[in-house]
Amino acid sequence: MSRSSAGFADFFPTAPSVIQQKRYQATRERQRSRPHLSREHADEEQIVTGSRTSGETVNGNSPQNLGQELRSDLNKSRKEVAEDGSASHGEANTPANNTSGPGTGSSNDTRLDTLTPLTNTESSPQNNPSPSQAKAPNGDEPDGFRQARANVSNSTMTPLHTPPTPTTHSLSQRVAIVKGSKLVHDPDRAPSKDKRKRPCYVDIVSDEQEGRLSDPRLSIQNYTRGAGCRQKTKYRPAPYVLRHWPYDPASTVGPGPPVQIVVTGFDPLTPLAPISTLFSSFGEIAEINNRTDPDTGRFLGICSVKYKDSASFHGSGPVSASLAAKNAFHECKKGQRIGNNRIKVEYDRDGQTSEKLASRAIAAQRIDSKIDMPVVGEPKSEAQVNKNEPPPTAPKGPSGRSFMRPSAVIPEGPRASFQKPAIPSLIEETPILNQIKRDPYIFIAHCYVPVLSSTLPHLKKRLKAFNWKDIRCDRTGYYIIFENSRRGEEETERCYKFCHMKLLFTYIMNMESQPYGNPHYERSPSPERMKQEQRQKAETERLKKEAELDIEEEKKQRALDLDPCTEVLAIVIKDLRDKLLEDVKSRIAAPALYDYLDPERHASRRKQLGIPDPEGIKRPMFRLDFDSRDSTPDPHAKFLNKRHPSGVSGLNILSALPRIRKAHRLDRTDVAFLDERRKQPLRRRNVRPLYHRLQQLHDAEDSDEEQHTPLSRDTDDQDSRPPSRIGSETESEDADEDAAEALDNSTERLDNEDRHSEIGDLEAAVQDYSPSRKRKRTSESPSHRKKQKESDDFSAVGEGTRTDDIPQVLDGVHKGTVSQGLSDSADESSRLDHNKVLLEELVEDIKTTHSEEPGIKTHHVQVRQSAENMVEGAEYGEAARHEVEWRVSNDEPRPIVDDDDSVVMDLDGWQDVVKDEEDLQFLRNILEKQPMSVIGNLSAWAWRQKEIKALNRPGDVGPTRQAASIEGYYVPNITGAARTEGRKRILESEKSKYLPHRIKVQKAREEREAKAKSDPQNAAAEAARIAAAKTISKSTSRSTRVNNRRLIADINAQKQALPSQGGDSDVLRFNQLKKRKKPVRFARSAIHNWGLYAEVNISANEMIIEYVGEKVRQQVADMRERRYLKSGIGSSYLFRIDENTVIDATKRGGIARFINHSCTPNCTAKIIKVDGSKRIVIYALRDIERDEELTYDYKFEREWDSDDRIPCLCGSAGCKGFLN
């Protein structure tokens, strides 16, 4: 094409105007290429529309009703044609019938199923009109419509004898598809309201080409190249290829990329070394396994390689296991060889691939070994022998054995045996049912279809119409296995429905359907469930083992803690409980009953009822006496009234709680604890029943010996008794009982010893009576014996000088003594008041009546001194425990108990303060609003509190009056709290007063100073020892010298071995500095903060450690020191080397900076030059033992006139007091 003929569209094919013109031309071509059928349909629609829109009236009908009448007539004519179709069907196929007029009986003009050029005889059946072709109700057809329809039919109908169009061509051109129906007449909406008419429907017909949708963008030329519209997105028919996301273990739930590969294709005889060399070039191998046959040990030519993560691989960066496996897989796909064979590599994520390959290789070797095995001397089976015999039902001919002779056997030479390879049997030996898990299957038992290998292919062909996955068989039958999905289950049911009980050759397939897999299969638990069960099992086993260990430990602990004393204590407690119940019955219940049955209490009642008084009243063996301030009832008041006419009667004026006391020696339960030197009491008479004891009568003239058990006093002195057997109340009770027995027998039998022993009891009671109204009974044996001796002296002096008025006073005293012995501890204070009054009266009478007798005066002085001593002892014992005084005050209201405010309110303090239920209720009321604290077991908490108190205050038991604290540890603050004091620096001298380790050093120092003052000789010896310690660095031991000589010899040998260089000495000295370092550690120091301690024994003059830090100039060191002080760093570690250089180890340094100062140090600091630089090294001044703190002298310049001197805290014997 020349340049002149080329146009704008040729040079610019993508211009918008050119594209628009091409689009217009393509649209016109599509319109021209439309099929002729559309035009024909258009003509038909035009004809029908023209007939419907004509304004003529047929049979008087309006134009609106014309269409409805035409449709009715058309339906009527079609019905008539259908009735006469059988008679006219044979004639309709001839040309004469096609040209017959309307007057004949032909119905060609009304047949609508006549073939057209677009249909054939196979398109659709005849005489099947649609619902829209029903007969009209009136049976008439308009002439105009019949004429038009005839014209249309004549122009469009084609006779049957016309050569038909080929079927394939007509189907490819147009295929009619009925999409649905359209309602054209609805009787419900018609204006005629004629409900007899039926609704009319018209089919909606469309062809395949019209129903097929096409992409309108494809009609645009070069649309895929972006020529349609440059502003729109380019059409991309292929999907995008996205980048593969790398594996991230933090956000990935599933398994990670494979780290194991399996290699095949190499020679099985290839050694493992070349395989390992090849695959180790991709990454670090964790495991390599060349598979072998487990039976024969032959290599299978299958090798699995597993990689692991490596931090550094061949000097490069880290390589992960998955990346190594990936590189090996892609590299080996390019054709890697091992030897002369090309290998094949596959991923093996879980080892399943290698297992499958190994199992296949092993099975193939088994088959090859069976084929290659020669058959020698194998007996023929019975089936082979009888293979050529006729069937058993065949007729038998005459026997010819008698006429047959054995033919001679012709010898044959050796010949090769050509054996066909045995076909592997398709019948599996392993049961298939156990291998099927959840796969749907159909089972055919072997009893219905015999299990043969040849039957399996025929069964597969028989079931080829179904989508099965595999068909397998074993000795039990056939298994038709489908895929494990919903579709597989449906296919299983469909196969069972169509093939169950059907024939397979001559057998019937009796099937058993299992659409949900093996019903007896138990699903293995998931990994999470297995891990959970394993964890639970491990936890249960652990708890069980711990319980068993606890039981064994408890058994061992019980065996160790088994104490016979504990068991004895339990037995004693049980016996005491039983004894207490017996005492309650005998001492409380029985006396209360006797008191209630006393006849005197019911005198008024007897008078009211007219009952006479009993003839005699016997006092029971139990005494229920009452003490009061004015009177003391006594059962033997008749003897006292004879001697005291003015004595008061035994009536109870002020009632109090009774004292219940058994008669003397009625209880023999404690005979084992009595002194064997005492006289044994006589055998008591039998006790009569209670009723007789209450009602028995006695004469006044009966002697006391008949009514009471004979008593005998103990004549042994109390000094002769063992002290351990004298109780706190035994003496007073014995004295009271002796006095009561003496009064029972006769008042005349009282001698001087008894009277003066009663005076001693009264004096002891006076001593017990404290001004604070709190009593503490003190019955100490030595004091009591001392008082008895004084009473004996008083009796000896004043025996011949007494007058008759003394017995009167003594009777009153005796009356108080008896009351003292018979009354209970609850009213002991009132008894003491009464006895005090009697004692004062007795002393005054003695003073006034016998003032001229020196013996009595002497005894009075002794009594007063003894009373003062007892009062002091009582006051001292009173402080130990405050007891409640349950009685009525006589002179003024007094508190029951006086609380001591100095008692520390810990657990023991609260137990001492709370006396009764009332105090406990008050305490509950106070603590109601306080929040409740959880303390767990109350007994354990109380025991723990008392154990803490015992640790803090050893030896203190019970209430204390001083809190547990360390003297000087808690420093008071002016503002009340350390937080409100603000920030201030605490001096080291103050820290030494309250820090525990400083207090320890301070105490050691004070003890040393006190010892030096008390013993000057030891002080001088200590000073000499300190002086020797200072000079010990000048001399060394023999072993140290030997070690030093050996070290020097080693250094000289190293010098000779090294080449001659100028810096050898510095290098050797630096090596010495590193080699000779001693093991040390830092810990809390008693001198100051942290300290350095030796971990081994260090000899004198040995190097210990180097003082390491940052080397700075003097000006920088001064600036840093000021900065450290401003920032609050209390300790700065600056060590001066020379005038211009300072080592700063405050923030950058070794542990040598923790060495503290001491006025008598065990180390020293030396400056040596190593490698041209000065170093600070710490040496030992003397032999240092293990765990001893290292110290050296800081050697600060002495500042005599300075006000800010640094105190020394070393605490040594030669301490100077200050560092500067």
From Swiss-Prot:
List all Basic and acidic residues biased stretches: 26-44, 70-82, 183-193, 520-542, 697-722, 746-759
Q: Where is the composition biased (Acidic residues)?
A: 730-741
Which residue intervals define the domain SET in the entry?
1078-1195
State any GO BP term from the record: methylation
InterPro entries per the UniProt record, alphabetical = COMPASS_Set1_N-SET, Nucleotide-bd_a/b_plait_sf, Post-SET_dom, RBD_domain_sf, Set1-like, Set1_fungi, SET_assoc, SET_dom
**Where is it localised?**
Nucleus; Chromosome
Q: Which family does it belong to?
A: Belongs to the class V-like SAM-binding methyltransferase superfamily.
Q: What does this protein do?
A: Catalytic component of the COMPASS (Set1C) complex that specifically mono-, di- and trimethylates histone H3 to form H3K4me1/2/3. Binds RNAs which might negatively affect its histone methyltransferase activity. COMPASS recognizes ubiquitinated H2B on one face of the nucleosome which stimulates the methylation of H3 on the opposing face.
Name-wise, this protein is: Histone-lysine N-methyltransferase, H3 lysine-4 specific
What is the native source organism of this protein?
Emericella nidulans (strain FGSC A4 / ATCC 38163 / CBS 112.46 / NRRL 194 / M139) (Aspergillus nidulans)
